[in-house]
Amino acid sequence: MYHSYADIPDPWDRLRWCRYGLDLLQKEVAAMVGMEEWLYRDLESGIFHRSFTPELADKLAALYGIPVEDILDDYTLFLHRGGVDFLRRY
């Protein structure tokens, strides 16, 4: 489907690409970063939940050796960067 990581437009496909590159199962990744398997499975399907915390995003990025911005959609990246707190101040 994709020839390189740079060709992948969607965060959820980047997660899958990285996991395949490390030859890991979804349940293995979930256990390594301390999340439920269903949550990781949903992330790879493009479903982001409130329980996908900035800390979990940072752990996944560290595991895969990529910038956290590469695995977050725009809304989740906004939340990760403290966007809600920023808006509350105004």
Residues of each region from the PLM?
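A short, Lys/Arg-rich alpha-helix, primarily the initiator
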Residues: 1-21
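Conserved hydrophobic/aromatic packing and binding residues within compact polymer-binding modules
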Residues: 15, 29-30, 40-43
